[in-house]
Amino acid sequence: MSLNEFLSLNPLAFVMTAGLIGLLIGSFLNVVVWRLPKMLEREWRLQAHDVLDLPAEAPGPTYNLILPHSECPHCGHRIRVWENIPILSYLFLRGRCSSCAAPISKRYPLTELACGLLSAFVAWHFGFGWQACMVLVLSWGLLAMSLIDAEHQLLPDVLVMPLMWLGLVLNSFGLFVSLHDAFWGAVAGYMALWTVFWLFKLVTGKDGIGYGDFKLLAMLGAWGGWQILPMTILLSSLVGAILGVILLRLRDAKTSTPLPFGPYLAIAGWIALLWGGQITGFYWQFVGLK
């Protein structure tokens, strides 16, 4: 019996396998969230030197998602293999560096746990098949983008655009929706927030939404089609408004303080992709139009 046959015939094994892989991916996403913004900043600095015709900076050490090896940001202690086991290492080390005893951010085990649970749920929801595998990839990408946007107010094109093209390619085979719906989902997703951006700017003279949000909604439209866009925009706006007010209260910040919108779009789009049809059907039934 092949591995594919075993996983397709044993749903629990597929869910557990997806959860374990999700834990490992979550550990890697911690690296992506930490390093990718720094890598982009380096790239932008080099581009700025070229555009402004400034003297070239001395080349620094190699810095990417692989090198240098992970180390403690406080003392520089190189993280060994046994110290990098998802969740377990954090518990074994009691949340502190083995060298300097500095506290390790709780974001690392929480990201690993969230990714593992998310992966297991996707596997359970879809069952073994291409849909589950591709939604896993999408979920990992959305999690990374959400964490980066929450911390840096940045949605990197290097994450958003490949996923948008992947959605279009997958739907050229009709994996989730037709290519026609996916294409217009991408176009409408971008144009919807682009229109809101310029209307808000004309009225207030301020930027209300980032360009990364346009691309993120376009990417979600490429996966789920134009049909999921109204629900995605509505859910993200409601959740963003509620949580935004709560965060502003907790931080004692002003209403002009910028808040990232990407995480709310990501959550709403993920929900709409998985349950959009059921939620819409329930709504029409609730209002008596079905």
Spell out what each predicted region is.
Residues 90-131:
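Short microdomains enriched in Cys/His and/or Lys/Arg
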Residues 82-85, 99-109, 147-159, 199-212, ...:
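Interhelical loop and helix-boundary elements at the membrane-water interface
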Residues 35-107, 261:
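Membrane-proximal soluble regions of multi-pass membrane proteins
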Residues 5-7, 11-35, 39, 195-207, ...:
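Alpha-helical transmembrane segments
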Residues 18, 131-239, 281-290:
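Functional transmembrane core segments of multi-pass inner-membrane proteins
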